[in-house]
């Protein structure tokens, strides 16, 4: 029953001797209706929306400038996510403005499309988060790295931005140029996306190489039937 119908029924019962009981009952039902089902629907829709809109963007709107507080909000996600043995060994270096040129010189994007020389001129990312580790890299550190990187990019999506994980970069030169105390493991580029990306369902064994056609970037994804082990 919709909210209007509940209100109309309450008004109708006001002259009835059972008004108090009916009023309390309907109010309780209304509270339940507003609380649990609606919250669950919003949560499910929100997660799916974020996952669908979170893509690996290589081109960004040059007219939009990422702010320091936006990078901080993204980095704050690290205080909320799990960490192996709760060691919390990852550290984060925000990069903006002129320093972005330093990072750009040491990263490589679009490895599967070398002929395009991505990103296109004028769409280069102008903000980054360099993720470092206070300890030697290990499988547990890499697990933490994956969790926090994905979570940060989802946060970026939620605030209207986008990004990409960059593993192809010159570690030692970047460490020296940014004067990093710890070894960099991953670079996140952040910005307002200027690309159209679509997912394409495919079967196991088919090509998984992303490609571009008429300005759209297509990303093959194996359908769920092939992902479930039986």
Where are these regions (language model features)?
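Acidic, surface-exposed loops and disordered segments
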Residues: 6-230
């Amino acid at each position: 029953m919709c909210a209007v119908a509940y209100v109309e029924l309450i008004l109708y019962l006001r002259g009835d001797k059972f008004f108090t009981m009916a009023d309390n009952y309907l109010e309780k039902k209304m509270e339940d209706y507003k609380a649990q089902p609606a919250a669950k629907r919003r949560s499910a829709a929100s997660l799916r929306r974020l996952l669908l809109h979170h893509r690996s963007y290589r081109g960004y709107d040059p007219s939009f400038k990422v702010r320091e507080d936006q990078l901080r909000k993204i980095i704050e996600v690290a205080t909320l996510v799990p960490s192996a043995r709760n060691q919390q060994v990852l550290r984060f270096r925000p990069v903006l403005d002129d320093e972005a040129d330093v990072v750009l010189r040491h990263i490589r994007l679009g490895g599967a499309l070398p002929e395009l020389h991505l990103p296109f001129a004028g769409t280069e990312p102008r903000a980054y988060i360099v993720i470092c580790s206070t300890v030697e890299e290990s499988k547990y550190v890499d697990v933490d790295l994956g969790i926090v990187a994905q979570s940060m990019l989802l946060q970026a999506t939620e605030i209207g931005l986008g990004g990409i994980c960059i593993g192809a970069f010159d570690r030692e030169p970047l460490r020296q140029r940014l004067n990093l105390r710890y070894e960099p493991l991953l670079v996140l580029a952040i910005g307002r996306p200027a690309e159209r990306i679509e997912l394409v369902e495919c079967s196991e064994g088919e090509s998984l190489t992303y490609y571009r056609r008429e300005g759209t970037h297509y990303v093959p994804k194996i359908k769920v039937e092939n992902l479930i082990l039986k």
